[in-house]
């Protein structure tokens, strides 16, 4: 017997023939990331088919290698078999990521600047430190033979200035 998508699910993404839906539980500061049956996007087994992730999931971005999951505390990669922490800082709320269809990379506006996945790398640490904003809207824009990652921010947040 299967269940429908859990009520209260917010961030939703398709990856490798399944629907993923994040449901945040503020009392425990945990998110359940539910996944559907293969190609049964409306069928969920709520007893076994989920990942438990610390913090509030704010984004899920599909890549060939992994489903990249960004929370308010960390950035993770879920490969279908295992989940691992990519960064010990989170992402900015809003639409903080965009995909480059040419190289199939995902670009993410994080609490510490611009990151790329997969493989994961922070592209701005060591070069520039900016306030991350409190809300983000992002896109990869191709124009005039060039591509740019553009992010529009609601001002706020604190820049991370790493001590060396």
Regions flagged by a language model, labelled:
Residues 37-49:
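A short, charged helix-loop
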Residues 2-4, 48-51, 130:
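Short, solvent-exposed secondary-structure boundary motifs
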Residues 33-35, 163-164:
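Beta-propeller blade signature
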Residues 12-29, 36-37:
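Solenoidal tandem-repeat scaffolds enriched in leucines and small polar residues
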Residues 17-18, 26, 53-164:
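Beta-sheet-dominated scaffold domains
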Residues 1-16:
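Disordered, low-complexity "stalk" and linker segments at domain junctions of extracellular
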Residues 13, 32, 42, 93-95, ...:
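Short, low-complexity intrinsically disordered segments
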């Amino acid at each position: 017997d299967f269940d429908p998508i859990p009520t209260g699910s917010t961030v939703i993404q398709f990856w490798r023939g399944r629907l993923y839906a994040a449901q945040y539980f503020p009392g425990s500061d945990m998110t359940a990331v539910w996944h559907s049956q293969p190609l049964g996007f409306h069928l969920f087994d709520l007893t076994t088919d989920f990942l438990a992730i610390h913090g509030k999931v704010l984004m899920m971005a599909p890549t060939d290698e992994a489903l990249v999951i960004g929370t308010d505390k960390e950035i993770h990669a879920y490969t279908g078999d295992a989940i691992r922490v990519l960064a010990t800082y989170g992402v900015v709320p809003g639409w903080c990521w965009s995909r480059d269809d040419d190289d199939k990379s995902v670009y993410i506006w994080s609490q510490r600047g611009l990151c790329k996945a997969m493989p994961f790398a922070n592209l701005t640490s060591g070069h520039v430190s900016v306030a991350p904003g409190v809300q983000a809207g992002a896109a990869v824009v191709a124009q005039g033979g060039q591509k740019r990652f553009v992010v529009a921010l609601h001002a706020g947040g604190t820049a991370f200035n790493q001590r060396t």
